[in-house]
Amino acid sequence: MPVRATKRGAARTPLHGEWDVVICGASFAGLTVARELARTDARVLIIDRYEIGERQTSACAAPTTWLEYMGLMDSVQQTFGELVVHTPGRTQRWSLPFTFSTFDYRRICALLREQSEGSAVFETATIKGPPARTGFTVHTDRGDVSAPLIVDALGWRRILGPGANVQPPDARLSRGLEIHPHARGDDLELWIDPKYVKRGYSWSFPADGELRVGVGSFDPRDHVKEPTVQLAEDVGVPAERWQGNWIPHQLRPATEDGIFFVGDSAGHCLPTTAEGIRPAFYFGLALGRELVDVVEGRQTREQALTRYGAFSHDHLWQYRWLLRVQNWVGRITPTRLLTPAIRAISPPGLVRWAFGSYRDICPPEYVLNRSRSGVLERQQTIGVSAGPDGQRAEVAGDGVHQQRPGDDQLQQASSQSM
């Protein structure tokens, strides 16, 4: 087995001290928070069990515009303007209203780290516990670190939350497993097929000489290794270079007991698609900007907790709709309704509307709008998406659809297919 780069032996010196901000977790969400704090004089400590970029758990794809606006294009490997969707006996090719790109995980983490250098110090350390913290002191295997502002970006376990956490298979989690064989492909592909998983989907994401092929189940009780082996055989690639993870599919409170939660620890991964990178960027920016206001004296910690918590909660209706779609897909996948249902939602105008609305949940323009704080930026951003008939529908200035386009259509389609 490969030896990880994590510090060992004499290199693991004691770690103690007080900081302005402690960020626990050094992947997409945590590094994005640190990126925003780089424009301040705050003393920021980032800690993670692994070195930055060391432990990939994602298929690593995101809307290209997000990568462009975040200054991360140097990590891009392949870009796709279409999505190929396979169901039993039929294949649909959807032309998307925006492109997705696969990227190199180690490189994108390095780029994010470069954007936070200057104020943030990174150290490898493992959070101990329970308890993982006492008040505003975090307990690690190298010592205790304290800060008035603490961020949990450690993933679905929500380690810094108060009380015991529900574990799989009882938690609201999906499970995913994938392989990374050395192979090439031209298409971003999905399989919605009970041959592989009854409640979920399978995928193949090409990434410049590597195929990321995997299976995800909405039901954490379902085993996904055998289906992944079967999919690899069908795609014609060896089942090698494995990775997997649990994936949250329900929004959770973004603040609790004085702690800020972002990314998977707050359930920010989008249901149905299990897209977690874009919301990690999005909510990481919002949280980072709130913390900037605290360290620069424009608001208190309590105000930041309230504002960031409200910002995350403002998206609850969108997460609930995606969870309904996820449940609907799970119900029809084992039935004969699956293929005709996917065919019914495949007209180009409907695809453009659906993906446009999906895009606007975490719009890339949010990166560029750097006004006083995350909540204000959300209020000032007007999201626009095309309806099924090609008409465009605005999102109100408070971040909530004045007329949520398509709710009636989605509800009608769901009821007809159930």
Regions found by a protein language model. Give the residues of each.
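Extreme N-terminal leader/targeting segments of oxidoreductases
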Residues: 1-19
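Glycine-rich Rossmann-fold phosphate-binding loop(s) that bind the pyrophosphate
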Residues: 25-27
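A conserved beta-strand/loop capping segment in the N-terminal third of enzymes
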Residues: 64-113
